[in-house]
Structure formats: C-alpha cells, structure tokens
Swiss-Prot record:
Gene that encodes the chain: Dnase1l3
Keyword Secreted among UniProt keywords: yes
Pfam families: Exo_endo_phos
Endpoints of the signal sequence: 1-25
Null allele phenotype: Mice develop symptoms of the autoimmune disease systemic lupus erythematosus, characterized by high titers of anti-nuclear autoantibodies (ANA) directed against nucleosomes and double-stranded DNA, the deposition of immune complexes in glomeruli and full-blown glomerulonephritis. Mice lacking both Dnase1 and Dnase1l3 show vascular occlusions following bacterial infection: defects are caused by the formation of intravascular neutrophil extracellular traps (NETs) clots that obstruct blood vessels and cause organ damage.
S-S bridge residues: 199-236
GO MF terms, alphabetically ordered: DNA binding; DNA endonuclease activity; endonuclease activity
Record-given protein name: Deoxyribonuclease gamma
Residue spans crossing the bilayer: none
UniProt modification remark: Poly-ADP-ribosylated by PARP1. ADP-ribosylation negatively regulates enzymatic activity during apoptosis.
Activity regulation note: Inhibited by zinc. Inhibited by heparin and proteolysis by plasmin.
Subcellular location: Nucleus; Endoplasmic reticulum; Secreted
Chain spans, region Not required for free DNA-nuclease activity but required for activity towards liposome-coated DNA: 289-310
Length: 310
C-alpha cells in the first residue's frame, strides 16, 4: 500500500499542533521549598535552581516559607522580573504567617500575570464546635482566573500538614471544600501541597478514614506509588494534587501529572539537591481553551462520521 504524498506533511502538522497545544497548556505546580528563609536566600546556587523551577510553571504553590521580615517573595520577584521589560512578568499572593505558638510558615502562589489573575482569597477559619484547630497551618484559599484555559476559574486549597496529624488534616479538607462552596459560586477545586500522605504518616489502613480519598468525586492525580522525596533512602508520596469538579477533571492534559525530579533535570548531586529542598515539586497541566475546543470538535466529527457509516 502506497502512502498519499501529503501524509508526511499531515503527520508533521499534527505533531506541531499537539506540541502547540501542550505549550499553550497551563502548568500548575506545588513545591515545599524546605525552610525557605534567610539562610537559603543567601545560598546562590540553591536560589538559582529554585528560580528555574518557578519559571517552569505558570502558577506554583510555594510552602514552608519561614521569613518574619517578608523579604522572600519580593526577592523572588526581583529575580524573576528584573529591571528589564519582559514579555512574561510574575506576581504573587501570600498568606499571613500561620502556625501554632512561635513556629510560623507561609503559603505563597507565584504566577505569570499574562496567564493568571487572582479573583479573591481568604484564610480558612478552623473553629468548628468540638473539632477546633485541626490544621497546623490553615489553608490559604485562592480563587484564580485564566482566560486561556478550558476551565476559566478554579479554586486552589493549599495544605502543609504536620506529619503526626496528616490523616486528620487531609480528611478535614472536605470541610474546607464545603465551606468554600458555601461562600463562592464555584465547582472547580484543586487541593495541593505537602500532605505528608505516605509511608508511616498515612498507613494503608488509614485511607478508609479520609473522606478526601473515599469520596469518588475527589480525583487524586499523584498516586501512592510516586516518590516525591529527594533522598534516595526514602520513597514516599508525601506531596499530592487532588481535583474536584467534572469540568476541571476533564480539562487535565493527559499524562501531564507527575513529579518533577529537579536533581536529574539539573544534574545535581543529592547533597546539592537537598540544599534546594528535600521534596520534589508535583505538577499537572490544564488544557488551553483552543485545544479543548478542538478536541471536542474532533470527537464530535468522529461520532458524526461513525453515524454516517452505520
């Protein structure tokens, strides 16, 4: 059988279109930067890697920011934006300092301004009768908008648990979900962060007590078999991404979720990688509105052709 002369060109065009759709997709990441404070800020090699990781993402959650002077994010903006006029500029939104007693951390979202904007935000208040103060660091809930993605609006609920109370904190995210829905008219949710959701902190028998896992409307993108830790001596799926909402679940780019091994990507030794963090980032992509529309048209066309043949 001979190939039509246009076949190679058509194949190349299809590959180009697929690559373009992947490029247009919005990459969302979650990264526990491990004790991100003054000492790490002075480690230039580690900071260079952190900036590279942030630049890979269109929107990234940064956790374990420990900086009472609030200099970390302004410093990052200076490194990301510089003084020149760039086509891509970054902005951020950051929580207040959260935690019990004197130990405090902050959540921060860094995002590309031309792709993402913040609609509104609030700190979840964990004051339920008989079940108070479950979270070590209450979620800093942010409602984002992106005009370029198939799903235009989505809420991100970040969480960094205390290892010993991970099971209860992860389960409590369902109450956060209910609270957000009662305040905002939105159905598309992303729960992401360092859940400490693996190994001894969340043993297999504990999953049956976690509503975020047992309720099928919550879709886990990072599976139990993943390793989000840098140390070779450990293999634990601590960092997770969970979605809720049919629209956002359907908008995920196939095979886009996973762990970003920056040690391998940037050819670092384990010691050099640990200077950056003891966690690898986790990520996934949301389809662009153009890709999503074209995919729906393609499916519709295939169905029509199939119907015509019957």
């Amino acid at each position: 059988m001979s190939l039509h002369p246009a076949s190679p060109r058509l194949a190349s065009l299809l590959l180009f279109i697929l690559a373009l759709h992947d490029t247009l997709a919005l990459r969302l990441c979650s990264f526990n930067v491990r004790s991100f404070g003054a000492s790490k800020k002075e480690n230039h090699e580690a900071m260079d890697i952190i900036v590279k990781i942030i630049k890979r993402c269109d929107l990234i959650l940064l956790m374990e920011i420990k900086d009472s002077s609030n200099n970390i994010c302004p410093m990052l903006m200076e490194k990301l934006n510089g003084n020149s006029r760039r086509s891509t500029t970054y902005n951020y939104v950051i929580s207040s300092r959260l935690g019990r007693n004197t130990y405090k951390e902050q959540y921060a979202f860094v995002y590309k301004e031309k792709l993402v904007s913040v609609k509104t935000k609030y700190h979840y208040h964990d004051y339920q009768d008989g079940d108070t103060d479950v979270f070590s660091r209450e979620p800093f809930v942010v409602w984002f908008h992106s005009p370029f993605t198939a799903v235009k609006d989505f809420v991100i609920v970040p969480l960094h648990t205390t290892p010993e109370t991970s099971v209860k904190e992860i389960d409590e995210l369902v109450d956060v979900y209910t609270d957000v829905r009662s305040q905002w008219k939105t159905e598309n949710f992303i729960f992401m962060g360092d859940f400490n959701a693996g190994c001894s902190y969340v043993p297999k028998k504990a999953w049956q007590n976690i509503r975020l896992r047992t309720d099928p409307k919550f879709v886990w993108l990072i599976g139990d078999q993943e390793d989000t830790t840098v140390k070779k001596s450990t293999s634990c799926a601590y960092d997770r991404i969970v979605l809720c909402g049919q629209e956002i679940v359907n908008s995920v780019v196939p095979r886009s979720s996973g762990v970003f091994d920056f040690q391998k990507a940037y050819d670092l030794s384990e010691e050099e990688a640990l200077d950056v963090s003891d966690h690898f980032p986790v990520e996934f992509k949301l389809q662009s509105s153009r890709a999503f529309t074209n995919n729906r048209k393609s499916v519709s066309l295939k169905k029509r052709k199939k119907g015509n043949r019957s």
